Amino acid sequence: CTPIEDNPFHLLKWTNPTALMKFYPEGKDTEVFEKNSYIPMKNDMRGGSQVIKYKDGYLTLIHETDLYKSEQGNKNATYRHRFVYWDKEFKNQKFSKIFSFLNMKIEFCCGLAQYHDDFLITFGAQDNAAYILRAPISFVEEFINE
């Protein structure tokens, strides 16, 4: 589950279909709200960055995992990413095209923040290196709206 900026005790449980979870600390209960229907896609959308408030809605960066067996029969995977933007009610969403940061099999985004006119994106590669990427907001918006 992923925290949602400006929504205390709310988490993004699923991206597709969008499902939010609210935690009630007094009773230690949770409630799940489904916001939209499943959109058929090749791979499952999984975790990534937290969900940040952006313009009139919310933005996150997720990864998709293409699972397969290696030549030796071992479980293997390739990770690719998408930006996902929702309106303020989490009803309508836009997906960017799928992409890779470094064209490596194992990549995992773990942070997204707005900093002036840029987004700062933190990610790991090959389970042994960490990076921070500074991307202009205008570039990300074009990428989402292609």
Regions found by a protein language model. Give the residues of each.
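Hydrophobic core register within WD40 beta-propeller blades
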Residues: C1-P3, S49-V51, C110-L112
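Beta-rich carbohydrate-recognition and catalytic domains
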Residues: T2-N43, K53-K105, F123-E146
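A short, acidic, amphipathic alpha-helical segment used as a generic capping/interface helix at domain edges
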Residues: M104-A113, D117
